[in-house]
Amino acid sequence: MNVEVLDISIDYGIDTSVGYFGVDLRAAHMESYEYQARPTDSFVEQAGSYTVPELRGNVSVWWNYDKYSAGATINYVDSFDQMYGVIPEVDSHPTLDLQATYDLTDNSRITVGALNVTDEDPPWSDSEAEGYSYGTAGHSPWGTVLYARATVRF
């Protein structure tokens, strides 16, 4: 296997009288993904095809003030070509996550949030060997997921 990936990470924040605001960008661009099934086989380029979207990443905006923080993240998985399906391309798939945190003490906090707030279905794929109707690499069938977390540091 030969892989070339460009990883990007950019963070920016600003302190204001109403709290600290931040923006984060994380992305990976698959420049090349050559796969060789057996040592005697030729390498096959798979970047942009099944299980290897060329681009995936997320952008987050967040705010902190005193004991409160909140954030939103847009996740993105690029479209990709199917190898064996009737439909030649699986659509791109953005989702939105939200969370809020309250610091109870210096050592404890509670967080609530939701993944895939808009309840986006994964894009349809008809080439899944496992029998699923979505691309399992980078996509989830769960829809909106609510969560709560308590953290205590000792």
Predicted segments, located by residue:
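C-terminal beta-signal and adjacent terminal beta-strands/loops
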Residues: 31-34, 76-81, 101-154
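C-terminal beta-barrel architecture of Gram-negative outer-membrane proteins
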Residues: 23-103, 118
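Outer-membrane beta-barrel channels and translocator barrels
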Residues: 3, 15-18, 30, 65-68, ...
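Intrinsically disordered, low-complexity segments enriched in small/polar residues
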Residues: 17-20, 25, 46, 129, ...
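Residue-level detector of the transmembrane beta-barrel scaffold of outer-membrane proteins
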Residues: 9, 20-24, 60, 69-71, ...
